[in-house]
Amino acid sequence: MALTALPPLGAIGMASPLFAAAPAFPGFGLAGILLTATGLTALATGPRRLLLPAVPLLALLSLVAHVYAPARPRPPAQIHAISTRLGRSPTDLSSWLNRNLALRTLVRHTLHSTPSGSTLLFPEDAAGPWTRWSSVFWRTTAALARARGDTVLLGATLADPHGGLLDALIGFGAHRVVTSARQPIPLGSWIPAGRRSYRADWSRFGPTTIAGRRVAVLVCYEQLLIWPAAWAFLSPHPPGLIIAVSNHGWATPGIREPQIQANAATALARLFGVPEVSAANGPRPIADAGSRKASDLHPEQ
């Protein structure tokens, strides 16, 4: 079980049985994962003489977890998640410019409508490819955010200095940060032998610090895996918040994967006993498919 839950095999181990730790041991975090792994392994391979004492013990620990689990904590009031309906990522200069113009309008509007000192979270790949012109394009917005003491977090595709691409979350304004997915989706983004593959990072442990907060950032596919969240909490100073960003601009009506992914992120937050803030991008409204304007972004805070 550990082989399929941890990288490299864990790179494709979505919907692991270890997700049972969330309802079984809420708030237990890493200990809950270990207890679940122990219980499932014992049920599958253990001799009956060991199961008789083990099952009641695990049931008792689960009861303790439910009795003493704190109420689901609320996210910090300073963090505002804005979901969008931008559709698929831009593939040419014209679509990139139109998308970023509309996104910039929304960012500036949100800056003016939230209290100073806020952190604004936008979805995975909201800004599309981050080029050398992106910093120029966003310069005045970054200055506005900095003057207000705000931090803006945009999902973007970033060129990796070591080759390939990064599925990144870029922060500017009062606090600057760049972090990226530990595990992009296999074959779709992460192609180990591909020259333009998104890079995986299996050796990065601990939280990311954003606007003075220790957070666990889960980018899209990572929300369906156990180990990226576990890696973030393997620290003497674990995160106090899960930030989940995703991009489902490709989704068609009836696709359930976005909801399954959102449920998985919520389960991880329950397991580790921390609040969750999420921002997702969805498909563009069918009626407006021929044009894009600021109102297409449909902010949801």
PLM regions: where:
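Membrane-embedded alpha-helical bundles of multi-pass enzymes
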Residues: 1-65, 275-276, 280
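Short, contiguous clusters of charged residues that form electrostatic/catalytic patches at enzyme active sites
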Residues: 31-39, 101-108, 200-202, 226-227, ...
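Hydrophobic alpha-helix-in-membranes signature
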Residues: 52-55, 122, 206
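Non-cytosolic juxtamembrane linkers/loops
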Residues: 60-112, 253, 257, 267-269, ...
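Soluble catalytic regions of membrane-associated enzymes that act on cell-envelope
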Residues: 69-185
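Solvent-exposed soluble domains appended to multi-pass membrane proteins
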Residues: 127, 132-135, 139-147, 157-301
